């Protein structure tokens, strides 16, 4: 593939540290503009019709401790960049962002496969090339820039606990967990004609409560579903705990403990030649700590 940038020639960094296990990256921006039309002529010009904003989505296999999980709270903005080389050339290009905030963290896991993580990022700063210095890209292969700790989990190092389930007779075969982190950007009017900072938000707030959603897929033997109308006299609540450790030691790669999570949906399915399965969905809301 002449003049193509192949996947093994690409690296992704968050705040200067490389991420391992990245499977795909998608970054984009759109410019909201509105045409100016005048009577008797039509279009004459255009104006900006909203704040400038971009989006990034990063999908990766969970093979070590996930630094992106720490971005779900009230953390400062972070930057990220994809660096790439053109095949057969020493030229280096980049596509990155700064002032990004994580808005969604999704974990999925099935029997026989490694856990996968997908993160959505809203960008309120600039997006494009040349957003990192040449010296930063020059050190991309250094020990400080590359995450060399590979410690993937296996099925024996992952534990899932649910108050409602007897996991000895009802087998969990898949799980999905999502943390939604809605952000609200606050903009201010410029104080002078040369106030360049007016194009960026003065602050970005985390909107509470945070919503956590956990879905479990079960192959059942003796599990009994709940009655729909029992919700009217008291929704079922229980604890759901997910712990994922590395296979070579007890290092925690990801951990989610949902105390008093609310059971909000169940579905039952069965087919010829298959087994009876139930899908359960729990929700948990997290308020701001006072």
Describe these PLM feature segments.
Residues 1-290:
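Signature of extracytoplasmic/envelope-associated structural regions
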């Amino acid at each position: 593939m002449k003049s193509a940038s192949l996947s093994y020639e690409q690296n992704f960094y968050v705040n200067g540290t490389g991420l391992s296990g990245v499977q795909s990256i998608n970054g984009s921006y759109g410019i909201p503009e509105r045409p100016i039309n005048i009577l008797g002529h039509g279009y004459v010009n255009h104006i900006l019709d909203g704040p400038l904003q971009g989006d990034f989505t990063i999908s990766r296999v969970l093979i070590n401790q996930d630094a992106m999980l720490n971005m779900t709270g009230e953390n400062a903005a972070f930057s990220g960049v994809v660096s790439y080389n053109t095949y057969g050339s020493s030229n280096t290009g980049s596509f990155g962002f700064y002032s990004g905030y994580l808005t969604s963290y999704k974990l999925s896991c099935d029997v026989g496969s490694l856990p996968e993580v997908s993160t959505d990022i809203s960008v309120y700063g600039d997006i494009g090339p040349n957003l990192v210095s040449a010296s930063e890209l020059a050190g991309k292969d250094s020990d400080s820039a590359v995450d060399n700790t590979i410690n993937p989990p296996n099925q024996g190092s992952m534990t899932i606990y649910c108050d409602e389930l007897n996991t000895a007779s009802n087998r969990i075969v898949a799980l999905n967990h999502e943390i939604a982190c809605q952000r609200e950007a606050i903009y201010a009017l410029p104080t002078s004609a040369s106030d360049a900072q007016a194009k960026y938000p003065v602050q970005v707030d985390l909107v509470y409560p945070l919503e956590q959603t956990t879905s479990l897929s079960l192959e059942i033997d003796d599990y009994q579903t709940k009655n729909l109308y029992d919700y009217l006299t008291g929704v079922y609540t229980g604890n759901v705990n997910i712990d994922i450790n590395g296979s070579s030691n007890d290092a925690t790669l990801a951990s989610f403990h949902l105390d008093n999570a609310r059971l909000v949906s169940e579905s039952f399915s069965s087919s010829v030649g298959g087994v009876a399965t139930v899908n359960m969905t729990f929700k948990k809301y997290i308020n701001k700590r006072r």
